């Protein structure tokens, strides 16, 4: 078990962000018509009681209900591109292709590329500004807003694109569908049955409160500003990464991937084997990156250097006792660390954990997080609203030595070059893994120009702060939606 330290015991006063609460929905009345429609079933499991209660709540609300889609609805157009067979290819010869699971990421990075020979309309797949995105299969009901960051990105046909007649309805409907009530209704039909596949036609059957234009505008403005701050944070990250690459004179990765053989072959000296005999550890690109760092940096050290980190924590497996929101700590997994506010986050009780165990589990602002199993090498920096959240044991925590290095460390590890240095340590035949010892040995350069390094650090921290502010604005929009629209009487 990892011992605690004074830095990790520091308590930061956070502005209070109201918890968006909904009334407990445990019962409802069912009409005889609904019973016959459900095959004369009388068991409660045939009806989503909470969804039916939510519909009753809206009917009794302050504002009249309006259909999302249809002649008198709020939606101008809702569609998804036609299905097509995907022809995947390498990065140099394809178009970056994004999956629905990346829709809610703050800064999506393409994991796949599709060939330009693919029989589809690429322009139709590209996202347009002022569009609401909605997943239609798999995990349905995930909501996203197309901002400058995602404009022009090619997403799959599993994403419904929605535009609105009135501009302010975009942010308003976004906030409603993000709320507990709205998302619950989106995933169920009129009888309360869970929908496994969502089509644009389903939106015509969904009715939401039609609040006054001034209230809609207020909510929309908060959502728009929240996404604008995310865009600004991404621009700062891009600028910091550019400065890093320029300072170290790092060439594009493709230039480092040279091969003169028809298959990937290379020789390794025994003295440099590090007792690793798996080829992935010795790929030449890693050595070329390290050689470039050594030639251009003032010094190349490792994450384990006390000037870089205070601790590298790989928590042991821990028992999870799940509780309701408001009664425990937020638990997030590796798939969620690139999201601002994970929609599928869970809550666990910490009542049974000792202080030492809890300190090894919870994270603090500006901690760098690295996924260690499955998809290895996803990197995030903890924003302020993640203070005391608990990532799963599949995420390694790197506690920075100080605020002066926290942002710089994140920028380097999140770069393409940092990713190569992380994934070189991958081991495992079925499930890929790395551990905390591997992370401690990852190379990190100190720049020759300390001012440039400090600038990179400040840009990263400023970006992280903007993401916290974006989170607060979205929570404010959800709070207004909850208090002044859904529960208004």
Where are these regions (language model features)?
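Well-ordered mid-protein domain cores that form the structural environment of catalytic cofactors
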Residues: 103, 121, 133-143, 174-188, ...
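Short, surface-exposed loop/turn microsegments at beta-strand edges and helix-strand junctions
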Residues: 87-95, 104-107, 111-113, 125-127, ...
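Sequence-specific dsDNA recognition surfaces
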Residues: 65-86, 101-129, 304-319, 335-365
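Short hydrophobic-aromatic micro-motifs
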Residues: 96-99, 132-135, 330-333, 369-371
């Amino acid at each position: 078990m990892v011992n605690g330290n004074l830095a990790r015991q520091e308590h930061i006063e956070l502005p209070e962000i109201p918890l968006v609460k909904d009334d407990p929905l445990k019962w409802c009345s069912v009409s005889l018509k609904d019973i016959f429609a459900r095959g004369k079933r009388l068991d409660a499991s045939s009806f989503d009681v909470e969804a039916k209660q939510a519909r009753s709540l809206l009917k009794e609300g302050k504002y009249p209900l309006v259909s999302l889609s249809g002649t008198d609805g709020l939606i101008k157009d809702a569609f998804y591109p036609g299905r097509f067979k995907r022809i995947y290819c390498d990065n140099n010869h394809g178009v970056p292709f994004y999956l629905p699971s990346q829709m809610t990421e703050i800064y999506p990075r393409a994991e796949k590329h599709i060939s330009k020979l693919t029989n589809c309309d690429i322009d139709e797949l590209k996202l347009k500004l002022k569009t609401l995105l909605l997943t239609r299969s798999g995990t349905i009901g995930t909501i996203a807003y197309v901002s400058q960051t995602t404009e022009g990105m090619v997403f799959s046909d599993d994403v419904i694109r929605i535009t609105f007649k009135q501009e302010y309805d975009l942010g308003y409907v976004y906030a409603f569908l993000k709320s507990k009530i709205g998302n619950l209704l989106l995933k169920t039909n009129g009888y309360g049955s869970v929908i496994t596949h969502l089509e644009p036609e389903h939106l015509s059957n969904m009715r939401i409160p039609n609040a006054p234009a001034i209230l809609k505008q207020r909510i929309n403005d908060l959502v728009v500003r929240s996404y604008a701050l995310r865009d600004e944070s991404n621009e700062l990250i891009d600028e910091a990464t550019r400065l890093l690459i320029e300072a170290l004179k790092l060439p594009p990765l493709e230039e480092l991937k040279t091969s003169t053989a028809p298959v990937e072959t290379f020789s390794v000296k025994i003295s440099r084997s590090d007792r690793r005999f798996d080829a992935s550890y010795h790929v030449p690109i890693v050595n070329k990156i390290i050689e470039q760092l050594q030639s251009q940096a003032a010094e190349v050290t490792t994450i384990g250097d006390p000037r870089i980190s205070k601790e590298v924590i790989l928590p042991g497996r821990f028992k999870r006792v799940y509780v309701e929101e408001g009664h425990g700590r937020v638990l997030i997994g590796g798939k969620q660390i690139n999201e601002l506010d994970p929609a599928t986050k869970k809550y666990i009780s910490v009542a049974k954990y000792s202080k030492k165990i809890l300190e090894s589990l919870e994270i603090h602002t500006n901690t760098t997080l690295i996924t260690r199993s499955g998809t290895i090498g996803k990197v995030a920096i903890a924003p302020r609203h993640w203070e005391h959240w608990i990532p799963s044991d599949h995420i390694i925590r790197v506690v920075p030595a100080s605020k002066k290095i926290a942002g710089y460390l994140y920028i380097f590890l999140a770069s393409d070059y940092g990713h190569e240095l992380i994934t070189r340590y991958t081991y495992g035949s079925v499930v890929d893994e790395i551990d905390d010892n591997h992370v401690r040995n990852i190379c990190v350069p100190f720049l020759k120009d300390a001012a440039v390094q400090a600038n990179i650090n400040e840009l990263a921290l400023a970006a992280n702060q903007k993401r916290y502010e974006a989170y607060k604005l979205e929570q404010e929009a959800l709070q207004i939606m909850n208090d002044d629209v859904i529960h208004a009487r």
